[in-house]
Structures are given as structure tokens and as C-alpha cells.
Regions:
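Conserved phosphate-coordination/catalytic loops
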Residues: 23, 52-55, 240-247
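A cross-kingdom marker for long, charged
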Residues: 235-301
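Bacterial Sec-dependent N-terminal signal peptides
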Residues: 1-25, 30
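Alpha-helical hydrophobic packing sites
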Residues: 4-5, 48, 269
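Structured, acidic catalytic/metal-binding patches in enzyme active sites
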Residues: 28-237
Length: 301
């Protein structure tokens, strides 16, 4: 296990990048037109957690939000009822806990580590969660700032200013169930390895910082190169975590886009490669082109 922080970003924060032909394509924002569309739609790659000062919308993205008919995220983030209903699906099936999956020594190590980090959720709750979801709560502590933000939340707040409907490409329940396809034991072992390396002063925080820099720079090629170093035991589940969902989304978008202009804001990990949303949309007959997405960040990169 060499790159668990990268794995977490690619699976939970979805930060895989798109392979690019030249540096002019350094952007997170893409225009979708052609194939009979009466008006264009737009695709934007998000990150689910970053420093608040970096959660800045470009003028281009603000204009798009103002002019599209609806905004689609991976899930409907404006549906509080659904969000409350999905809490139970974050837990492992069969009343499984981390204590069932780990040796006594490893369990105590994980418990002490979480409690020492002062997680927002009590360990008694986190130990019932699917280990990769529990592990994702550790990432926020690795960010080089005190105040964090979600790009999706920033986009949604802007959309609400213009009373744009908020939709989801899939249900929260389905999204939470995806991790059931990865053996809980494997997830738990990865969590232990991550904590072992972090306690030894490993370079996970450095890698996380480099990934966030690449995201701020919109250097999707760099992100992809870093994430290709992910642990192969988790990479074996890329179809379930990313590609199957990409295919489902594109099929849905093929029906939605002819009738209305959309902004589709999903984790940047869903954009890349042969099975990424950009290429799948192109295969479906749409023209997908980069859009300049220049932001004025509060602090230097």
C-alpha cells in the first residue's frame, strides 16, 4: 500500500484527471454541443473538499450558472430528506464493525488515531461505517488551512441566487452502496496501512497538497499521473467506482440535454480517459471542447 491518500481522493473525492493533448486544455470546464442540441450544456470537474480560499468560481462558470436551465450534481445536494435517509447506508452491512475486521492491536491503533484527530463524528459511529468512508474524514485534517469548503456547495449557492433547479444524476443511496462492492476487509486493511504510514511521518499530506495544487492549477494531466500510482488492490475496482457510473450518467444526459441547457458538476475523476465522461460524450456524438476557467485565487499557488 503506497498511495492510500491518492486512492481516497480518486474514490471518495474523485480527483482523477483527464489526459490532455496540450497545455491549452488546462481547464476543469468543458462545453457540450452538437448532435442535435439546440443549446450547449457544460461539464465541470469538482473536488469535494478544499481550502475555502480556493473555492472560487470563475466569471465563465458564474455566467454559465446564470444562463443554464438546471444544475446537475452527482447527487441532489438540495434534498435534505434524501440526505438524512442515506445515513444508514453509510454503515457496513450485517452490523459489521471495524472490530470484526481487524486484530485487537490494529483496532486499538485505529481507534486511538481517530480519537486523537478529534473527528467531527464519534469513533463509535465511524467504526460502523464502510472503512473508506470513515477514512475520508481524515483527509480534511491534511488540508493546509483551517477553513474548508466543497466546490459543489459553492456552485449550489450561486445557482440558488438565480433560482436554478438542483438535480442529481444518481441517488445518494446508490452512491453509498457502491463501496459495498469492495471487500470491507480490504478497505479496513488499507485504513490501517494509511494510519501506519501517517504515524511514521509518511508523505500522504505532501501528496495531498500536491494534488490540491494540481487541481487549483487545473492541471488535469498532472492529477492523472499522480493517481495512476494508486494501490492496484483498489484500482481493480475502478469500473465500479467510476466507469459504470460514468456510463449511466451519459445515458441519462443523452435524454436530458436535448430539452434544456445544463451545468453538470461532478468529481473531476469522472472526466478522464476512454471511459471518462468527456470521451463517452464524444463517442455518443457530442462535441466536447475546453472552456477557459480563469479564477483569481485569494492566495498564491
Amino acid at each position: 500500500m503506497k498511495r492510500f491518500s491518492a486512492v481516497l481522493l480518486s474514490t471518495i473525492m474523485a480527483l482523477t484527471a483527464i489526459a490532455q493533448k496540450n497545455s491549452s486544455d488546462k481547464t476543469l470546464l468543458w462545453k457540450i454541443n452538437g448532435n442535435g442540441l439546440k443549446q450547449p450544456s457544460y461539464l465541470f470537474g469538482t473536488i469535494h473538499m478544499l481550502c475555502k480560499d480556493d473555492a472560487v468560481l470563475s466569471d465563465s462558470l458564474r455566467s454559465i450558472i446564470k444562463n443554464v436551465k438546471e444544475v446537475y450534481f452527482e447527487v441532489d445536494l438540495d434534498n435534505m430528506f434524501e440526505m438524512l435517509g442515506v445515513l444508514g447506508k453509510m454503515k457496513m452491512n450485517g452490523d459489521t464493525t471495524l472490530q470484526d475486521l481487524l486484530s485487537e492491536a490494529d483496532y486499538e491503533k485505529v481507534k486511538n488515531y481517530f480519537e486523537s484527530k478529534g473527528s467531527l463524528l464519534p469513533f463509535s459511529m465511524l467504526e460502523t461505517y464502510k472503512p473508506m468512508l470513515a477514512a475520508s474524514t481524515l483527509q480534511q485534517g491534511g488540508l493546509p488551512c483551517e477553513t474548508t469548503a466543497m466546490m459543489e456547495q459553492v456552485i449550489m449557492e450561486e445557482a440558488k441566487e438565480y433560482k436554478k433547479p438542483i438535480r442529481g444524476l444518481e441517488s445518494m443511496g446508490y452512491q453509498a452502496s457502491v463501496l459495498d462492492s469492495i471487500p470491507y476487509k480490504l478497505q479496513a486493511d488499507q485504513l490501517v496501512s494509511y494510519i501506519d504510514n501517517a504515524m511514521k511521518g509518511g508523505d500522504e499530506d505532501k501528496e495531498l497538497s500536491e494534488m490540491l495544487d494540481a487541481y487549483r492549477n487545473q492541471d488535469l494531466q498532472k492529477l492523472e499521473e499522480m493517481l495512476m500510482k494508486s494501490d492496484p488492490s483498489i484500482s481493480n475496482y475502478t469500473d465500479v467506482l467510476l466507469y459504470n457510473r460514468n456510463r449511466n450518467w451519459v445515458e441519462k444526459l443523452k435524454d436530458l440535454m436535448p430539452d434544456k441547457s445544463l451545468l453538470i458538476a461532478v468529481g473531476a475523476g469522472h472526466l478522464p480517459g476512454e471511459e471518462g465522461c468527456i470521451n463517452l460524450l464524444r463517442k455518443a456524438g457530442f462535441k466536447v471542447t475546453p472552456v477557459k476557467n480563469i479564477t483569481m485565487l485569494v492566495r498564491e499557488i
